Amino acid sequence: MTKVIKSKYKVSRRLGTSVWGHEKDAINNKNYKPGQQGNSSSISKPSDYSKHLIAKQRLKSHYGRISEKQFRNTFKIARKKSGNTAENLVGLLERRLDAVVYRLNIAPTIFAARQLVSHKHIKVNGKKINIASYRVKAGDSIELSEQAKQIPIVIGAISKKARRIPEYLAFDDEKFIGNFIRMPSSISEVPYPFDPQINLVVEFYSA
């Protein structure tokens, strides 16, 4: 197991949930923080601040450990938009190109999805985009480069029988082209492997 994978598993253990929903995630067997010797009844309950902080860290980690500056700026945009701030925030995060590639199951992890984008393996409406935070919009097509179609992890991800693609996206397995059909209609439509507690995140930045 590589140091990177170990680090990811430690994140899940530290945050108390499987942030990316991996079956091999250590949290499934060790439901306590790194360095802690098993579950202990003497551990104090988290404060309200800790609950809000953990909710924020879980969401940031789920989207590939977005920087605090970038995440905070995304929240500011969500708050300025009309409508529900929590839904706006999720909508903006789901529009990130690396997140779309991940949701389309073109890559097995959000980190692999980001690599595909940064290495110019992804096209949006026929144009190569290498910015992970690039925001796609309804109607945009997402296409793999010819080289990417031969990458083993891409082939493996696409060929999985248990692939689950959200209703707001679509993917043509033969043409290797995906579509961002629309924005998520609700937070519950987004396939988070944990309770995202978006309202706690909103409250954290609104305090």
Swiss-Prot record:
GO terms for biological process: ribosomal small subunit biogenesis; translation. SUPFAM superfamilies: Alpha-L RNA-binding motif (SSF55174). Residues 95-158 form the S4 RNA-binding domain. Residues 26-47 are annotated as: Disordered. The keyword Nucleotide-binding does not apply. GO terms for molecular function: rRNA binding; structural constituent of ribosome. GO terms for cellular component: small ribosomal subunit. Pfam families: Ribosomal_S4, S4. Keywords: Ribonucleoprotein, Ribosomal protein, RNA-binding, rRNA-binding. Disulfide bonds: none annotated. Residues 28-39 have a biased composition (Polar residues). The keyword Cell inner membrane does not apply. Belongs to the universal ribosomal protein uS4 family. One of the primary rRNA binding proteins, it binds directly to 16S rRNA where it nucleates assembly of the body of the 30S subunit. With S5 and S12 plays an important role in translational accuracy. PANTHER family: 30S 40S RIBOSOMAL PROTEIN, SMALL RIBOSOMAL SUBUNIT PROTEIN US4M. NCBIfam families: PRK05327.1, rpsD_bact. Part of the 30S ribosomal subunit. Contacts protein S5. The interaction surface between S4 and S5 is involved in control of translational fidelity. This is Small ribosomal subunit protein uS4. It comes from Orientia tsutsugamushi (strain Boryong) (Rickettsia tsutsugamushi).
